[in-house]
Amino acid sequence: MSTSAKALTKRLIEIPEMRRIQHLHFIGIGGSGMCGIAEVMNNQGYKVSGSDITESLVTKRLEQIGIDINIGHDSKNIANADVIVVSSAIDRSNPEVKAALEARLPVVRRADMLGELMRYRHGIAIAGAHGKTTTTSLLTTMMAEGNLDPTYVIGGKLNASGKNAALGSSRFLIAEADESDASFLSLHPMAAIVTNIDQDHMETYGNSFDKLKAAYIQFLQNMPFYGLAVVCGDDPELYAMIDDIGRPVLTFGLEPFNDVQAVDLVTEGTKTHFTVLRRDHEPLRLTLNIPGVHNVYNALAAITMATDEGVDDAAITRALQKFEGVGRRFEQHASVTIDDGDVLLIDDYGHHPKEVDATIKAARQSFPERRLVMLFQPHRYSRTRDCFDDFVEVLSSVDELLLLDVYSAGESPIAGADTKALARSIRLRGAVEPTIVDKKNIAAVMQRLLKANDMLITQGAGNVGQIAIELAANDLYIK
């Protein structure tokens, strides 16, 4: 059988009704939600191409695995494509979208493409305001350790594999479900996890928390009646929704009424030891290689689902011991020697006040002797406005605070929701004196500010992660 025939056979097995599609083009392919799906489709034997406005480590890696990448958007980029896949950030004014519509090519959302991948598999979708990426990564690691070899699509790089996604040999597909644009409603999984609910991305839901909660219920009701919902019982909003789900439910948390409970938590550096109590199972003592109580919750969610899917305790134990974390989730980048000590650089993606607070608490627990210096980049003017007071409170708890300009993510500025306003309010609170920095003065600020045995945390969902890489490459500018 020829190579092309083998590839076609593979595609027909994976997604039988997509036999008419040979070439998929992804607009915005460098995005965290797009690159994983593109990689899975490439691994299944489809021709995959993509475009993005800027080159990145992600686009470079996709090129290395054989995906054609164009930097910049141009109608010529979609030549010979059969279908166009777009992220929620791409609108009809994009020249590639315009060309596709003129050519009568189907233009589908990322979530719809993920939904097609999931339709022919045993899909497990992970939703929630916080912790989706880590929970998805933990569950993937557990099921792989249990020899279930799942396909996975994650919103961050799994450090152990260096990938956002991989094609497995089993029927399992594990994927993040994105509530930010309500696209998770396009998914129809066999089982689902909801880590928590919070008032974020409220513009999608008409600034109505009730509409947001109703969307989560609809997401869970997209499962068949024999599916399984795994939800955090310690989240009062989630717990109050259980009776409306209409599907089998298992709860997890630290409170004793949960189906799966963690007790006897002990922090040891960046590790957390805890015991899991489950009905009809012996207590299981575990060690998690990432810090923070929030990550114990993420681990509990994954353990609950993995146990139900038949992963044994030995595999769960090995998975947690081996887990190397996720890119930009409390990722330790560098340790730079200075005077009689060092400065530790940690990078974290968290951009909501609760996520930033969780990072700060995990850092304090892991490195209590270090001074905490945070370089924070607010993400979106709307989030800065909606969570302004919470940001002021949380950011006031660090020892030194550096603030970058708001990463707009395409939004127009909002009066009173910029970095200067945030700095003024934090200064008035009196706990810490914020310093506004940019790329031009960051080197001088680091040289002046950092001391032996500090930890510097770069925090946010914008391009601050790239700044962390540059800081690490230049020894934090302190040498």
From Swiss-Prot:
It is found in: Cytoplasm. It catalyses: UDP-N-acetyl-alpha-D-muramate + L-alanine + ATP = UDP-N-acetyl-alpha-D-muramoyl-L-alanine + ADP + phosphate + H(+). InterPro entries: Mur-like_cat_sf (IPR036565), Mur_ligase_C (IPR004101), Mur_ligase_C_dom_sf (IPR036615), Mur_ligase_cen (IPR013221), Mur_ligase_N (IPR000713), MurCDEF_pg_biosynth (IPR050061), UDP-N-AcMur_Ala_ligase_MurC (IPR005758). Its EC number is 6.3.2.8. ATP binds at residues 128-134. GO terms for biological process: cell division; cell wall organization; peptidoglycan biosynthetic process; regulation of cell shape. Keywords: ATP-binding, Cell cycle, Cell division, Cell shape, Cell wall biogenesis/degradation, Cytoplasm, Ligase, Nucleotide-binding, Peptidoglycan synthesis. GO terms for molecular function: ATP binding; UDP-N-acetylmuramate-L-alanine ligase activity. Disulfide bonds: none annotated. Pathway: Cell wall biogenesis; peptidoglycan biosynthesis. GO terms for cellular component: cytoplasm. The keyword Cell wall biogenesis/degradation applies. It is an enzyme of class 6 (ligase). Cell wall formation. Belongs to the MurCDEF family. PANTHER family: UDP-N-ACETYLMURAMATE--L-ALANINE LIGASE, UDP-N-ACETYLMURAMATE--L-ALANINE LIGASE-RELATED. This is UDP-N-acetylmuramate--L-alanine ligase. It comes from Psychrobacter arcticus (strain DSM 17307 / VKM B-2377 / 273-4). The lineage of its organism: Bacteria, Pseudomonadati, Pseudomonadota, Gammaproteobacteria, Moraxellales.
